[in-house]
């Protein structure tokens, strides 16, 4: 077992929490965007569409880098089997809890909102299964992907550790140019795989289980491993925490390319493959933008920040059905998109915080939504991982 840094990575805790909480304005703005969702406003807003696209273009790539960073830190702290058990429990238990308590009621509500309840009995067995796979996993998809990644990394992290024992990691040098080329190739590789599947057997791409377990894992795994490498190599971490005008400019140009692809691309052509290449390199450059920004402004301990770090997962889990409820039953009564967006934020965040405070007072719910046994500690002010 290797030692881990004693200094708390406050800025990474904060970034991870804020990235998760960004899911709230992301999904509320989705209601008012030009993108088709479960519920939409009568007229889309150009600026809220732009805001929605911006968040969507990089948020989860950066999130998985941080997840990989902390996962490898715990990999060095625990024996292999315990590491796998701890990691899977911390993401798997909240996911399994949220399905019957959150996404199943959400699915039932949407069946009536969208007028599909009467047609449900007429669906084939496969269509019912596939619909449930999409709707019950829903916004919990990243937890399922983390379970898959953790299982894969039992082997990957062992290989990384064994290779480090036979090499001098101090001589490893990284550059953003080299990383950009690597991630460009990874994006092209992913695009080739997706296009091949589209040619050979296109229906599998609309299968929810295949999409989450295979395609999402395949896309985000490089970011997860990059996070682990950032923990191992201080030079790589410094590359991300040091502000880079080149990365900022490249990310801005990549986002413009992302918007153009969204506007002019066609799903029947190469839109999704092009998007995977763009978001692969955009995600890499945004790691530098977000890490350097967070390292400069968020690398401190604060009771208020700690509260939201601890609350972020629960708030994210409950915000989705609250957002859809707001979109289905309240949005039609608000004529202004921006007013609706602000009211949605107040509605969702307010109720989510109230529910969070209630669940803290019920030990069983606290365990189910965190995946961690409830342990009473005195003066424990450190944010939970």
From Swiss-Prot:
Q: What is this protein called?
A: Glucans biosynthesis protein C
Locations listed in the record? Cell membrane
User: Got a GO cellular component term for this one?
Assistant: plasma membrane
Q: How does it sit in the membrane?
A: Multi-pass membrane protein
Question: From what superkingdom does this record's organism come?
Answer: Bacteria
Where are the bilayer-spanning segments?
Answer: 17-39, 54-76, 88-110, 136-158, 179-198, 213-235, 242-261, 276-295, 308-330, 334-356
For the protein in the UniProt heading, the enzyme class is transferase
- Pathways per UniProt: Glycan metabolism; osmoregulated periplasmic glucan (OPG) biosynthesis
Keywords associated with the record = Acyltransferase, Cell membrane, Membrane, Transferase, Transmembrane, Transmembrane helix
């Amino acid at each position: 077992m290797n030692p881990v840094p004693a200094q708390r990575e406050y800025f990474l805790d904060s970034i991870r929490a804020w990235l998760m909480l960004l899911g709230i304005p992301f999904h509320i703005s989705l209601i008012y965007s030009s993108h088709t969702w479960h519920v939409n406003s009568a007229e889309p807003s150009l600026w809220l569409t732009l805001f929605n696209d911006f968040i969507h273009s990089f948020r989860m790539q950066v999130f998985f880098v941080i997840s990989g960073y902390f996962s490898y830190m715990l990999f060095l702290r625990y024996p292999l089997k315990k590491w796998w058990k701890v990691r899977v429990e911390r993401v798997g238990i909240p996911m399994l809890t949220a399905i019957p308590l959150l996404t199943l009621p959400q699915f039932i509500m949407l069946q009536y909102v969208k007028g599909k309840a009467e047609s449900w009995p007429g669906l084939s067995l496969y269509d019912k299964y596939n619909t449930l796979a999409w709707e019950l996993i829903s916004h919990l998809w990243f937890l399922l992907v983390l379970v898959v990644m953790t299982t894969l990394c039992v082997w990957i992290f062992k290989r990384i550790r064994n290779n480090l024992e036979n090499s001098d990691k101090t001589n490893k040098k990284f550059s953003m140019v080299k990383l950009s080329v690597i991630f460009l190739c990874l994006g092209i590789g992913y695009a080739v795989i997706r296009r091949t599947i589209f040619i050979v057997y296109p229906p599998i791409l609309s299968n929810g289980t295949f999409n989450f377990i295979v395609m999402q894992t395949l896309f985000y795994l490089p970011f997860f491993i990059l996070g682990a490498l950032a923990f191992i190599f201080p030079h790589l971490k410094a590359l991300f925490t040091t502000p880079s005008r080149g990365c900022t400019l490249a990310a801005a140009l990549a986002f413009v390319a992302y918007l153009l692809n969204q506007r002019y691309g066609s799903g029947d052509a190469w839109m999704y493959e092009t998007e995977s290449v763009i978001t692969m390199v955009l995600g890499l450059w945004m790691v530098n933008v977000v890490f350097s920004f967070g390292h400069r402004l968020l690398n401190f301990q604060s009771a208020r920040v700690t509260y939201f770090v601890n609350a972020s997962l629960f708030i994210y889990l409950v915000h989705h059905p609250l957002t859809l409820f707001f979109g289905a039953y309240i949005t039609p009564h608000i004529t202004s998109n921006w007013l609706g967006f602000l009211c949605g934020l107040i509605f969702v965040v307010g109720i989510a915080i109230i529910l969070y405070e209630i669940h803290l007072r019920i030990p069983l719910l606290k365990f189910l939504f965190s995946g961690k046994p409830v342990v009473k500690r005195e003066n424990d002010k450190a944010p939970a991982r």
